[in-house]
């Protein structure tokens, strides 16, 4: 498998990352282990999670995903075959959130315990924290890198101005810089990333590992009507917003390309992202071996210029699309 450099970190990652939000939430421990084994045994090495996964689920406190990954790492002996990414900053209860030095030091040790490892390959700021000076946050990350607890750092959900500020502060003070950005990006959600973040990442050599690569499943073609959406737990909020003129136009273009390439709409959606010059590795999740096989096969699909152009055109926003 052709690995890709993640920014200037020195890390080499597979062209697709497994999104660990499902572990301990919609996927139990046994199936999580099977999915992770299949992923790594197929040559993929990139796994992304966060300390907060899956705090939103009833009865969960956060850390469930990290604990399952950690147990798998210990039992499988495959730690040296994984580029392990996690995040810090989302609310974890009891006032624990943000990017203050004290909280980062506490949170990284908690993540290391749950992950049953002595280092995190990519430690990401899950959200921006305007209340903490950028130099304090980056300085703390520098301590963690020097201590061997973290290899590289990344940012998630940062605006272009704040990412620029962080890169400039790091350069000016000789501190570690964010080597990756984790933004929302897919065929349905293009404008925010492409307008300012994409050119910035290309110019500054920042890797991009975008989340919601399949728009919460919408780009698989599974949801084409209100009735379909009502069957999903996410339907009322996340997926329903995509079910409009533009969304249906995107699905039609995906269907056309899928037929041409003997692929699925979801595979085409992933392949379109992988063809973008700024994208290092989209993040996608699977809840079954069948879904995982489909995701992995998407990395072998190379769209030609005509297919990419058709998808580009179909996903352009117009004033009538919100209806």
What are these regions (language model features)?
Residues 53-58, 91-96, 219, 294:
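A short acidic, helix-capping loop that chelates divalent metal ions and anchors anionic groups
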Residues 20-30, 91-102, 131-132:
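Active-site mouth loops of central-metabolism enzymes
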Residues 27-39, 99-114, 163-168:
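Short, acidic/polar
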Residues 132-318:
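Beta/alpha (TIM)-barrel catalytic core signal, keyed to glycine-rich beta->alpha loops juxtaposed to Asp/Glu
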Residues 21-23, 52, 87-91, 125-128, ...:
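Active-site beta-loop-alpha junctions enriched in small/polar residues
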Residues 1-81, 146:
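N-terminal binding-site loop/beta-alpha segment at the start of enzyme catalytic domains
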Residues 112-131:
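Active-site groove signature of glycoside hydrolases
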């Amino acid at each position: 498998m052709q690995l890709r450099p993640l920014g200037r970190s020195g890390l080499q990652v597979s062209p697709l990352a497994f999104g660990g939000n499902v572990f301990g939430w919609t996927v139990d421990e046994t199936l999580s282990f099977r999915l992770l084994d299949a992923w790594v045994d197929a040559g993929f090495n990139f796994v992304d999670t966060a300390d907060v996964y899956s705090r939103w689920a009833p009865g969960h406190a956060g850390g469930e995903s990290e604990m399952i990954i950690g147990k798998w790492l210990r039992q499988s002996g495959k730690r040296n075959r994984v580029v392990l990414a996690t995040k810090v900053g989302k609310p974890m209860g009891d006032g624990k959130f943000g990017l203050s030095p004290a909280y980062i030091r506490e949170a990284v040790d908690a993540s290391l315990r749950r992950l049953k490892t002595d280092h995190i390959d990519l430690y990401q700021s899950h959200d921006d924290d305007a209340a903490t000076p950028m130099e304090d946050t980056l300085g703390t990350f520098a301590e963690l890198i020097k201590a061997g607890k973290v290899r590289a750092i990344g940012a998630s959900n940062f605006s272009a101005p704040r990412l620029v500020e962080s890169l400039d502060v790091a350069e000016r003070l000789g501190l570690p810089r964010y080597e990756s950005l984790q933004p929302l990006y897919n065929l349905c959600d293009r404008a925010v990333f492409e307008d300012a973040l994409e050119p910035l990442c290309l110019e500054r050599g920042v890797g991009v590992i975008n989340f919601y690569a399949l728009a919460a499943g919408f780009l698989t073609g599974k949801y084409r009507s209100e009735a379909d959406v009502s069957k999903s737990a996410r339907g009322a909020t996340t997926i329903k917003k995509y079910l409009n003129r533009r969304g249906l136009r995107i699905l039609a273009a995906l269907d056309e390309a899928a037929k041409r390439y003997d692929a699925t709409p979801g595979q085409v959606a992933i392949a379109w992202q992988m063809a973008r010059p700024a994208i290092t590795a989209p993040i996608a999740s699977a809840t079954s071996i069948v879904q995982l096989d489909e995701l992995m096969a998407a990395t072998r699909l190379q769209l030609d210029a005509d297919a990419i152009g058709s998808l580009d055109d179909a996903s352009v926003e117009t004033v009538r699309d919100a209806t």
